[in-house]
């Protein structure tokens, strides 16, 4: 994300592929990084590394094709009116991001375990850059294009578009058990850390930030770290 500098800030973002706040929080983190690295008062500007860790908000979600997203939310969150309010609030949050997120709540929701396997595969194949491309592709698939996050065909298309695997190789991977144990271990690790909601961002392996904080909040923490004013 930047050339090597005197200060490296490591971010581990625990998230789920069907968590809208994870998408918003990720966009806010990227915006905070861009603004900080453009700040002439910080010289040299800090270097950031990002890695995603797995979490499932709802392990009971059925496999693809899953079930209607809105109907599931209505049962889980307390009815149609409450869900409509939640959806509208999230649409507004998305449009405030830079670049904007165009949340669309049609389509189905299904189990996210295979999406997490693909995210981990991206890290194995190409490190941070590949993983970020896959995460961004998955967020866009589910939240902006009403795609099925559990569909092997949809996931394989994300993998191919990100350049980590050809589509047929991605389908072969998804049909296997490769990285299943590693992802399940990641779920357990989040639980052992006491993470009960996402996004949850761990900075420099020591400092935890819960939720999709505002861009300015992330930026202030990063700025203090870069200036040596915050010791973790």
Give the label of every model feature segment:
Residues 8-14, 18, 25-41, 52, ...:
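C-terminal cap of thioredoxin/glutaredoxin-like
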Residues 20, 78-81, 174:
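Short, surface-exposed alpha-helical recognition segments that flank or form part
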Residues 1-5:
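Plant-biased recognition of short, low-complexity, intrinsically disordered N-terminal tails
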């Amino acid at each position: 994300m930047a050339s090597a500098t005197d200060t490296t800030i490591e971010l581990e973002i625990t998230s789920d592929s069907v968590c809208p706040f994870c998408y918003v929080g990720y966009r806010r983190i990227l915006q905070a990084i861009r603004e900080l690295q453009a700040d002439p008062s910080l010289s040299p500007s800090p270097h950031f590394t990002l890695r995603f860790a797995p979490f499932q908000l709802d392990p009971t979600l059925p496999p693809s094709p899953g079930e209607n997203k809105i109907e599931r939310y209505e049962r889980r969150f307390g009815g149609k009116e409450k869900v409509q309010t939640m959806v509208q609030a999230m649409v507004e949050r998305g449009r405030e991001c830079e670049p904007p997120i165009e949340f669309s709540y049609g389509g189905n929701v299904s189990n996210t375990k295979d999406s997490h396997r693909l995210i981990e595969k991206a890290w194995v194949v190409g490190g941070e850059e590949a993983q970020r491309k896959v995460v961004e592709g998955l967020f866009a698939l589910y939240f902006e294009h009403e795609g099925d996050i559990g569909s092997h065909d949809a996931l394989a298309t994300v993998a191919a578009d990100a350049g980590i695997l050809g589509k047929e190789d991605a389908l072969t991977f998804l049909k296997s058990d490769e990285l299943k144990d590693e992802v399940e271990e990641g779920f357990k690790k989040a639980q052992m850390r006491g993470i009960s909601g996402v996004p949850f961002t761990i900075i420099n392996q020591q400092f935890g930030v819960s939720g999709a904080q505002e861009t300015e909040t992330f930026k202030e923490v990063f700025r203090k770290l870069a200036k040596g004013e915050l010791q973790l």
